[in-house]
């Protein structure tokens, strides 16, 4: 018999591999609000089963750490035991022979140091975490929209009720149905079975089938006046809820139209502007006054707003571009992505027919710029990114969409300098090849590779490496600023300037649409409280009874798009919504966590805030 033979996995190995895959799905959809001590103990136990057991630190050290953590959870540990965990974990970290032991020890160290208060409470026999967690998808949504509720309503064909329920927490259901990054899906418990429910797709189905003219009740006038600086999603969200509470709201917007980055940062092929206009019209119909083309700090003094209004909400967007800081970046032909997208939002679509375009960046703005350039007639579009595709911050579907539109990815290339012709116009971008190096903060860092620079011909170079906030006027007025961001409390108030509130990009940096909506909602509550109000935003729509049928494994319905060769020639909508059959199947995949064991909705869901 030959000494070599083909090795096949045993049944036990195949079973263990399946269990590990199930565990991976559970870790990906890990909910918020769970006990950090229990999570740490579970991860240490998992790592201990993965070690080879040949070195003492892993074989004995991890077992001892797990035993000590069990004592913490049992309430039998003392303060000295917490110190023992820290000391033992440090010893394992520096002496383990493999990465499994080292990383397990680092997890234990991180836990006992970062959550020391939780460990001490456990030692006293108490735990601040309970089994009464919020529904994972609701907790994952920054605006805390009642997602299981509106999915049940969509499945029942009650689309207007679904939109009414969404608007209790988010006045932009249509905009989010088309462009939201859907963080709610990251914690969907359906991932335990197969894959997350397509929540955004179901929301879009409701928006596409609602009847026009959403009715909204407005409270009795309070006599209080509020100024909102910035007509983007955050500012309009605050205006919407403050108007519903009965306050008189005036929105100041420096552009010719409302919408902020929804209008001037997201192209029409992703979010049709007719839908955005309809949603904004609904908000302003509540009595919100709008002043367009007004730059606060230039056309009107901030002090005048302080004098004329009872409260002021500052919610300006990040409309300034970050610089590459390389030679030649100020040459004609080098344009900021935000400026280009802003021009498109104003209806000024440049003609790039026959041009070679290079886009620098790896975020959603870079993908929007690249895909827009293709629609503007560019002969070729190359996306240059200094890291790998896997490290890009853009949504995977946006990266796929750019490639299908005919854009080319150039990974691991960092901009070095811009080449110009004798007239000073950009003709090429030179890039320095990179290689992935050490991991910092959970993300691999690139470093220059020992390779010559590459020349990338380009008549237009679009820079999309991030945005800045222009907060100079507000800092001069006296609002506390750090790194161009206005500093505020978690409730959006500014203690240094009573009556002033802030949120959105200008408070925490460029973020997503749903984060801006969260900021506006939080600010509306804080402003109402500051003005002496105690108004509620309610929705008393009755949710259908839960379906008790089994949820068998079933594939996720994905949103289709028009063919790349067809859609890359125009700015018409790319994504195709679900059919009724697809909607019913996808809504039926929802596990109903608001009813079955997990959610805090048992005994009555939250109908007001």
Predicted regions and their residues:
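Redox cofactor-anchoring modules in respiratory/redox and cofactor-processing assemblies
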Residues: 1-129
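FAD-site-proximal beta/loop scaffold in flavoenzymes
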Residues: 330-354, 439-510, 514, 543, ...
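Feature captures the FAD/FMN-dependent oxidoreductase FAD-binding
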Residues: 220-221, 225-229, 277-326, 417-430, ...
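N-terminal Rossmann-like FAD-binding beta1-loop-alpha1 element of flavoenzymes
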Residues: 224-250, 366-374
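A conserved FAD-binding loop/helix module that cradles the flavin
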Residues: 506-537
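Rossmann-like dinucleotide-binding cores of NAD(P)H-dependent redox enzymes
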Residues: 248-251, 255-286, 290, 370-417, ...
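Glycine-rich dinucleotide-binding loop and its adjacent helix/turn
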Residues: 205-219, 278-298, 321-376, 481-497
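Local cysteine-cluster metal-coordination motifs and their immediate loop/turn environment
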Residues: 45-67, 90-107, 128-149, 171-192, ...
């Amino acid at each position: 018999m030959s000494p070599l033979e083909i090795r096949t996995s045993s049944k036990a190995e195949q079973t263990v591999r399946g269990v590990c895959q199930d565990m991976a799905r559970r870790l990906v959809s890990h909910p918020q609000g769970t006990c950090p001590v229990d999570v740490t103990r579970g991860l240490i136990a998992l790592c201990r089963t993965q070690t080879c057991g040949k070195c003492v630190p892993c074989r004995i050290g991890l077992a001892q750490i797990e035993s000590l953590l069990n004592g913490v959870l049992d309430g039998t540990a003392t303060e000295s035991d917490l110190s023992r965990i820290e000391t033992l974990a440090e010893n394992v970290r520096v002496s383990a022979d493999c990465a499994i032991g080292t990383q397990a020890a680092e997890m234990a160290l991180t836990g006992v140091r970062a959550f020391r208060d939780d460990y001490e409470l456990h030692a006293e026999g108490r735990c601040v975490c309970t089994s009464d967690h919020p529904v994972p998808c609701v907790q994952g949504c920054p605006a805390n929209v009642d997602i299981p509720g509106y999915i049940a309503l969509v499945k029942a064909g009650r689309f207007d009720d679904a939109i009414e329920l969404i608007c209790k927490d988010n006045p932009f259901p249509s905009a989010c149905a088309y462009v939201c990054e859907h963080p709610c899906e990251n914690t969907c418990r359906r991932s335990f079975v197969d894959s997350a429910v397509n929540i955004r797709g179901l929301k879009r189905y409701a928006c596409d089938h609602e009847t026009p003219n959403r009715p909204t009740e407005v409270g009795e006038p309070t006599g209080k006046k509020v100024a909102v600086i910035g007509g983007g999603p955050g500012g309009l969200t605050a205006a919407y809820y403050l108007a519903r509470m009965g306050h008189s709201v005036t929105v100041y917007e420096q552009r010719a139209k409302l919408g902020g980055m929804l209008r001037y940062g997201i192209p029409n092929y992703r979010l049709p502007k007719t839908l955005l206009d309809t949603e904004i019209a609904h908000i302003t119909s509540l009595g919100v006054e709008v002043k367009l083309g007004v730059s606060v700090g230039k056309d009107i003094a901030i002090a005048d707003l302080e004098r004329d209004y009872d409260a002021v909400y500052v919610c300006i967007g990040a409309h300034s571009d970050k610089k590459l800081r390389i030679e030649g970046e100020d040459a004609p032909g080098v344009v900021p992505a935000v400026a280009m997208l802003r021009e498109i939002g104003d209806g000024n679509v440049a003609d790039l027919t026959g041009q070679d375009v290079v886009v620098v960046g790896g975020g959603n703005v870079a993908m929007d710029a690249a895909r827009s350039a293709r629609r503007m007639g560019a002969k070729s579009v190359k996306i240059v990114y200094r890291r790998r595709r896997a490290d890009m911050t853009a949504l995977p579907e946006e990266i796929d969409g750019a490639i299908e539109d005919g854009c080319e990815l150039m990974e691991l290339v960092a901009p070095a300098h811009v080449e110009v012709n004798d007239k000073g116009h950009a003709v090429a971008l030179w890039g320095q090849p990179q290689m992935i190096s050490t991991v910092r903060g959970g993300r691999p860092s690139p470093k220059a590779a020992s390779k010559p620079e590459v020349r990338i011909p380009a008549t237009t170079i679009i820079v999309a490496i991030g945005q800045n906030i222009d907060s100079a006027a507000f800092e001069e007025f006296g609002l506390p600023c750090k790194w161009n961001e206005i500093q505020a409390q978690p409730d959006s108030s500014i203690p240094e300037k009573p009556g002033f509130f802030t949120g959105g990009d200008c408070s925490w940096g460029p973020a997503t649409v749903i984060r801006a909506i969260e900021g506006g909602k939080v600010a509306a509550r804080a402003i109402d409280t500051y003005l002496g109000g105690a108004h509620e935003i309610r929705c008393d729509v009755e949710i259908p009874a839960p379906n008790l049928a089994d949820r068998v494994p079933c594939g996720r319905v994905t949103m289709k798009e028009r063919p790349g060769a067809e859609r890359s020639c125009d700015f018409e909508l790319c994504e195709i919504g679900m059919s009724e059959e697809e909607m019913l199947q996808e809504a039926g995949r929802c596990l109903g966590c608001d009813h079955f064991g997990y959610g805090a909705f048992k005994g009555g869901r939250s109908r007001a805030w």
